[in-house]
Amino acid sequence: MVYGLGEALKNLNSYCQERTTRIRNSLSPSRPSMSEATATGSSSSSRASTTIPSTPNMDVTPTVEDPRQNDNNASGMTRDEFRQYGKETVDYIVDYLENIQKRRVVPAIEPGYLKDLIPSEAPNTPESFESVMEDFEKLIMPGITHWQHPRFHAYFPAGNSFPSIIADMLSDAIGCVGFSWAACPAMTELELIMLDWFGKMIGLPAEFLPLTENGKGGGVIQSSASECNFVTLLAARFEVMKELRQRFPFVEEGLLLSKLIAYCSKEAHSSVEKACMIGMVKLRILETDSKFRLRGDTLRNAIQEDRNLGLIPFFVSTTLGTTSCCSFDVLSEIGPICKENELWLHVDAAYSGSAFICPEFRPLMNGIEYAMSFNTNPNKWLLINFDCSTMWVRDRFKLTQALVVDPLYLQHSWMDKSIDYRHWGIPLSRRFRSLKLWFVIRMYGIDGLQKYIREHVRLAKKMETLLRADAKFEIVNEVIMGLVCFRMKGDDELNQTLLTRLNASGRIHMVPASLGDRFVIRFCVCAENATDKDIEVAYEIIAQATQHVLHDSVKAVIAEEDEEAVALEEMVADLNITETPEKCLTRQNSANAAESGQKLERQLSKEEILAQKQHESLAKKRSFLVRMVSDPKCYNPKIVRHLNMANHRKMSQDLYRDRTLMQTISHSQRPNRLSQSPGSAGSAFFDDDDDRIVADVQTGLQTPI
């Protein structure tokens, strides 16, 4: 066996020497080969009895062509092309943002529009940048909802600014993945400093700041507020489970977990509910006061009730600036209760948190000193592109102990002196998000950012004033920041019609919410450079659409009355009754009541049952956005028309059903009803037996025998 291995190594050595000789000969043809050099050495030295191969000269380096110099299309884009196309793209971005008001706010397309426009297979050969950009404008842009449009007033702002775009370009060019300090030291350290800067800007207590001397607090940038809510819930769950395992070492963890219960208000973001679902803990959704705020007494009573049931309260998620109406839970009441009961208090200020850089808004977070964690989204209201959600914790060790996974290949020699942000969230890979926060804060300054926030609040107040001055509208929320919730004075159906008409026009975009079981329309100031003119134009669009809705509703009522009269007349004619429709209905109802002794109850349709259940559940659950931007019914006229046609068909079917029921009732009241057979004249009222059977079942009458 040893002999075989030695022979193999000898053969391998000979092969390597031969390959070295060939390479040297191909690079330097004039230089003598290894065998020639060996022969020369033998003739000049009589003492050499054997031929000794010379050591290969390894200073000869093959000249490898730089692939970046390759000018063929296989490289995707050369450096010179990138310079050219990069400048063209910057020009395109500037032109797009300058002229965005000329575009529809929402696209006039239907779901699946792109599938038939893009080939089903990827191209085998490279395509030019010009071709790709042409298709981008022709195929992609028609399907874009323009969040930077001056009349985009849905949801909350999507932060955007030129400094942030440039910072993202640099981050993408660097292309680092900063899961640890060693993976990219500058990324980790800049994030640490930016969380300290921003925390001071919004007035967080020093216990939360990363650079507080001898402090336990810390900050991290997550991908979204949803992730912030989730990781804080996991940290709170880990903390309480650790204590429960010590107190009840022989109880199964699954049983302990089933006893945990968290709390939030009905106006809290849906991500709290999702976090509890994933975390496998119960969630109790609490009622709010008349201003849609969670109060301390409500929480205290819920905690006591659940403890009486054997449950273990452990987590409370509060909101400063709710999604539906920008209301503020009362932290000064909730905080002491959480401290008294040793509950983890989390504060979600995704939208409003950026406004706390203005001192006049900081009283809204009185009680923050009781919180264990806090998050806000600069990518909403601080001119920073998505994604950038900042989160702080009072004790960073309670967060990281719930998330630490430390395989060998991720360890490094500086772990005891640095922060590894991979232990602060769900993903391992992390982007250089702090770079855009640094660029924006430096290039706007705190003064510039404060001016931006205050201008949005002023414009929201202006819209509130315009709507209050119009007798057709009412304001539903307390306008504190940049969100106005309003509705037409009337029923929910009118307001739904108004919103559908507004979004279908493509001139403005808003979304609804449900407040106090009422359908309301949300108007949020979103554009960076929004002006008084933009607000006035938005109000005029709303006012004009309202006039059309009111006019159409009056016409619809008149038309509906005419249709009912015609239907009754047709029914009378079919039944050969000479009385008026009103008298006919009265006589029929009286006779039916006398015969059966009970009133016939109209059976609810499937749609009506679902609507009733939704209405009942809405009073118990948190408010939600009824329709999202992905719902084409909000803005697509084609689908709106299709739905209207479907409703018309349903009305026609309902009318036919009612006529059939009336015929059945009338037929059942005739004296000779029992003497008639299915094939007799009594069956002449029905087109077929199925109609008669359905009518009999729905009216509760027996089929004639």
Swiss-Prot record:
Catalytic activity: L-tyrosine + H(+) = tyramine + CO2
InterPro entries per record: Aromatic_deC (IPR010977), PyrdxlP-dep_de-COase (IPR002129), PyrdxlP-dep_Trfase (IPR015424), PyrdxlP-dep_Trfase_major (IPR015421), PyrdxlP-dep_Trfase_small (IPR015422), Pyridoxal-P_BS (IPR021115)
Location relative to the cell: Cytoplasm; Cell projection, Axon; Perikaryon
Regions of compositional bias (Polar residues) in chain numbering: 22-32, 667-678
EC supergroup of this enzyme: lyase
Coiled-coil spans in chain: 554-620
Protein name: Tyrosine decarboxylase
Gene: tdc-1
